Amino acid sequence: MSEPTKAPAASAGSRAATKKELPEHFKAYKHVWVFIEQERGQVHPVSWELMGAGRKLADKLKVELAAIVLGPDDEATQHAAAEAFSYGADLTYVVADPLLTDYRNEAYTKALTDVVNTYKPEILLLGATTLGRDLAGSVATTLLTGLTADCTELDVDADGSLAATRPTFGGSLLCTIYTLNYRPQMATVRPRVMPMPEREEKPIGRIITHPLGMVEDDIVTKILSFLPDRDSAKSNLAYADVVVAGGLGLGSPENFQLVRQLAGVLGAEYGCSRPLVQKGWVTSDRQIGQTGKTIRPKLYIAAGISGAIQHRVGVEGADMIVAINTDKNAPIFDFAHVGIVTDAIRLLPALTEAFRARLSPHSRDRIAS
């Protein structure tokens, strides 16, 4: 079976050779924090996914889990702060200021680093989104600490250090990285890598507010206008319940339309493997895998996809994987729940017609919801 090899984690003894005694001021750093990403009043779902992961880390360390919310002083920011308790937060830190209405690196970096320096978290987690990646890098640089990006697994070892695992060497190796001598220990995680925790209605707990300590003249970046994305065809691939995807085994861009047709009948999103994006058959926002989207659908149908390691890491969280491939030895059959050895070009139209005959439009909506 072809799967990424996990490099053996360094033993406590081998890490001791590189681990210095933590400076006295770092010993005061406790608790796990999750940055709650919101834009225009909408919280990115990866924030709640990270709350679930953060809750597990905090429980292992026997410390508190805190959310950190930055935004304008409005109802949406206060709602995000309160909602964090429903996803496991013990307390929430809030920096609310008109200067934080739209994301600007200078203001957000100042706000987050000030709160970190004041309240001293041991672990700080952010989503590996466009905003999160930009912010995490500048915050880690400002704090002079380490950052592990695009993690696929988070844990704490026997010493209580964050063990952040991520793919490396083109996805052929999983490497566990430690920040041994600095605090906070920072990591980013892509959307849908971690499962969404169950939301539980809970009373609002402690909310601690902190001032921004910045004025408009301190910020080089200026917001001239805001133009919302009006691309109605933009994919919601990462959060779709049903996904149909195609790979090189389909042979041509014309045959890829068979994937789109089946997805349309099922009320599903469609995606592809990396080679199709490289060939220009499909746009990059539809790519699934290590360098594309990570998905966790209830049903994933993969047609003509070999299932290389880089693709596997993006789909193995799916509840049900149905693989269609002419090669019975294709790696995708090692992790698919259902494998069909046949030509996808012949099977896809038959599936489309069968589902079209059996499913009313109402039924298709129900499958995709």
Curated annotation (Swiss-Prot):
Disulfide bonds: none
GO terms for biological process, alphabetical: fatty acid beta-oxidation using acyl-CoA dehydrogenase; nitrogen fixation
SMART domains noted in UniProt: ETF
Keywords, comma-separated and alphabetical: Electron transport, FAD, Flavoprotein, Nitrogen fixation, Transport
InterPro entries assigned to the protein according to its UniProt record, in alphabetical order: DHS-like_NAD/FAD-binding_dom, ETF_a/b_N, ETF_a/FixB, ETF_alpha_N, ETF_asu_C, ETF_asu_C_CS, Rossmann-like_a/b/a_fold
Leader sequence segment: none
GO molecular function: electron transfer activity; flavin adenine dinucleotide binding
UniProt: FAD binding residues: 299-327
Assembly information from the UniProt record: FixA and FixB form a heterodimer.
Family to which the UniProt record says this protein belongs: Belongs to the ETF alpha-subunit/FixB family.
Main function: May play a role in a redox process involved in nitrogen fixation.
Protein name per its UniProtKB record: Protein FixB
Organism: Azorhizobium caulinodans (strain ATCC 43989 / DSM 5975 / JCM 20966 / LMG 6465 / NBRC 14845 / NCIMB 13405 / ORS 571)
Gene behind this protein: fixB
